Amino acid sequence: MQMENLITTFPEIEIKEHEPLAHYTNTKTGGPADWLAFPVDVAQVQQLVDYCHQTGLALTVIGNASNLIVRDGGIEGLVMILTRMQTVKVEGTMVTAAAGASYIEVTKIARDHSLTGLEFAAGIPGSIGGAIFMNAGAYGGETKTVVDHVTVMERDGQIHQLSNEEMDFGYRHSAVQASGAIVLDATFALKLGDQNAITAQMEDLNARRAAKQPLELPSCGSVFKRPTGYFAGKLIHDAGLQGYTSGGAQVSTKHAGFIVNVNHGTATDYLNVIHHVQETVQEKFGVQLETEVRIIGRQS
């Protein structure tokens, strides 16, 4: 089976060839995927995973690409974007959301059912799959605190469930980062609450986010992990790096923990800014900043 037959092999799945990933990433940067597929359900994911397993074609899975930098050289092989898998089901206090569902939309559905526990995620721009992959969190909350179980597909096509404990959640970490398993859906165990109180908390957190973060510009969200005993944004601010620019990428003047695309920036611009920030903070404070953002793809 030849790779060049991928589109004709799966006529029922939308697949694009040499598709620029800048059209899909929140940074508006990133080179082309050799192939970009848009599965709409688990059966289509299964077909593509089986094909890659059998042929050895490289497979990369992405969601909303909100905390992701794709290098300008693009991505080899097949990229599967799961954002068309958006089903959300509510049963009592349990909410099951497909990998491509918007985390923000899931928090709204929970609110509409008077379910509390997901308020912290009201403004997190990623998909459910991405949130599970990196144990996304904000304002003192973490995804791991409300996950009951996760359905995953291994790279050989096997599907099974992982409990919260088996997911091995940590700070911006989960078991699927190392295993390569693909998140298909996640079930959240929530509690009945007061809808007005839930709404008020979500609105408060969204207002705080809008006041402090550069939501009006393309970015990849929080770039660096929180170093033990420090705040990355404060270190970057204290190093005098706010406003530092390379090409079209800039350390946000609104929040030092963000790098924004101010003028047709490239992934290389982003990576240059990240490297300069890391070097400067290390030099001035002796603190090594680790990236939270996922960086993938070929060198340009």
Curated annotation (Swiss-Prot):
Residues 28-193 form the FAD-binding PCMH-type domain. Signal peptide: none annotated. The active site is at 172, 222 (proton donor), 292. The keyword NADP applies. GO terms for cellular component: cytosol. The keyword Cell cycle applies. It catalyses: UDP-N-acetyl-alpha-D-muramate + NADP(+) = UDP-N-acetyl-3-O-(1-carboxyvinyl)-alpha-D-glucosamine + NADPH + H(+). Pathway: Cell wall biogenesis; peptidoglycan biosynthesis. Pfam families: FAD_binding_4, MurB_C. It is found in: Cytoplasm. Cell wall formation. PANTHER family: UDP-N-ACETYLENOLPYRUVOYLGLUCOSAMINE REDUCTASE. NCBIfam families: murB (TIGR00179), PRK13905.1 (NF010480). This is UDP-N-acetylenolpyruvoylglucosamine reductase.
